[in-house]
Amino acid sequence: MAEEITKSYLKKKQYSTTRYLEARIKIHQFTKNKHSFHEWILNNFNLSLFEKDKTIKILDIGCGTGVFWKKNSKTLNQYQIDATLTDFTEAMVEKEKENTKEVSANKTFEIADVENLEKYRGQFDIVMCHNVLYHAQDKKKA
């Protein structure tokens, strides 16, 4: 019988290492889109609305392995950014640190649950939360 997908399951089985997420990310290499998934996300932020000499505060909820930041480092490094990068497990946060070394942003790394983010409310110019909400058991809380 299949194990129920709970937070405990996700933490212990799916995201205790980064390999399963990294395998899913590799699927995108077969896309025929002009831009990668991560470039597409960045293009939809419309960073041109922000002045390059002003700090942009970004919260990345469920940052995963930090591949968004790694793939977009050249563009992101043109801006002054204070980034709070969060994920559900320590394994992901450790990989985020490794993958975001090229990004010049002032980075803070935290373990955080998508359903318990009250402390971040109202502090950011941009809040990212891609490919995360389907993990939340209580979607309204998330």
Feature annotation, model-predicted:
Residues 2-53, 67-68:
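Conserved class I S-adenosyl-L-methionine
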Residues 34-38, 89, 139:
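Conserved donor sugar-nucleotide recognition element shared by glycan-biosynthetic enzymes
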Residues 59-116:
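Class I SAM-dependent methyltransferase SAM/SAH-binding core
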Residues 128:
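A conserved beta-strand element that flanks and buttresses the S-adenosyl-L-methionine
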Residues 131-132:
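Short catalytic micro-motifs in class I SAM-dependent methyltransferases
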Residues 136-142:
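A short, conserved alpha-helix within the catalytic core of class I
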